[in-house]
């Protein structure tokens, strides 16, 4: 398994495509090995789940508001009919603290994302040239990946 020794082909494909759809065996372990290889090559990495992202660009990169869960009967005198909106820092903000490093955003459970959300993820690296994205799209018998753009064109 030369891939697990160096990660060179994965690194080259990631640099070329900027967004990859990954299919890994369900027993796991492959993603952490590849993350370790990418860190060794100078990437700053961030791994998170794709569940509950909503608008990926806003949720990951911009300051945005959220509403806390409704906990039953509450007074509307203070907050109005819509409820209180809390400002939340971007989830992947720690990736953008250092401008000199390449950045790798790794999303688990990417199969829950819609076509439009995947298309938004494909557009993200155009704004920041050093940002690369890997989305795990499900299981496979062996570790394989392809361009996220090709995946969206062929699967939807």
UniProtKB/Swiss-Prot annotation:
GO terms for molecular function: oxidoreductase activity, acting on NAD(P)H, quinone or similar compound as acceptor; quinone binding. Its EC number is 7.1.1.-. Transmembrane segments: none annotated. It is found in: Cellular thylakoid membrane. One of its GO terms (cellular component) is plasma membrane-derived thylakoid membrane. It catalyses: a plastoquinone + NADH + (n+1) H(+)(in) = a plastoquinol + NAD(+) + n H(+)(out); a plastoquinone + NADPH + (n+1) H(+)(in) = a plastoquinol + NADP(+) + n H(+)(out). It is a peripheral membrane protein. The keyword Signal does not apply. Keywords: Membrane, NAD, NADP, Plastoquinone, Quinone, Thylakoid, Translocase, Transport. InterPro entries: NAD(P)H-quinone_OxRdtase_su_N. Pfam families: NdhN (PF11909). NDH-1 shuttles electrons from an unknown electron donor, via FMN and iron-sulfur (Fe-S) centers, to quinones in the respiratory and/or the photosynthetic chain. The immediate electron acceptor for the enzyme in this species is believed to be plastoquinone. Couples the redox reaction to proton translocation, and thus conserves the redox energy in a proton gradient. Cyanobacterial NDH-1 also plays a role in inorganic carbon-concentration. NDH-1 can be composed of about 15 different subunits; different subcomplexes with different compositions have been identified which probably have different functions. Belongs to the complex I NdhN subunit family. This is NAD(P)H-quinone oxidoreductase subunit N. It comes from Prochlorococcus marinus (strain MIT 9515).
């Amino acid at each position: 398994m030369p891939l697990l020794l160096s990660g060179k082909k994965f690194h080259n494909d990631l640099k070329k495509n900027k967004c990859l759809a990954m299919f890994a065996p369900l027993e796991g372990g492959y993603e952490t090995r590849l993350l370790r290889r990418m860190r060794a090559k100078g990437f700053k990495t961030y791994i998170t789940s794709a569940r509950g992202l909503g608008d990926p660009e806003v949720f990951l990169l911009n300051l945005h508001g959220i509403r806390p869960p409704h906990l039953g009967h509450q007074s509307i005198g203070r907050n109005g009919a819509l409820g209180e909106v809390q400002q939340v820092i971007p989830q992947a903000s720690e990736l953008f603290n250092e401008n000199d490093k390449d950045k790798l955003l790794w999303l688990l459970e990417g199969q829950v994302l819609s076509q439009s959300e995947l298309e938004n993820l494909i557009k993200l690296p155009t704004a920041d040239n050093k940002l690369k994205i890997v989305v795990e799209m499900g299981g496979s018998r062996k570790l394989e990946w392809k361009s996220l753009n090709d995946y969206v064109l062929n699967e939807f």
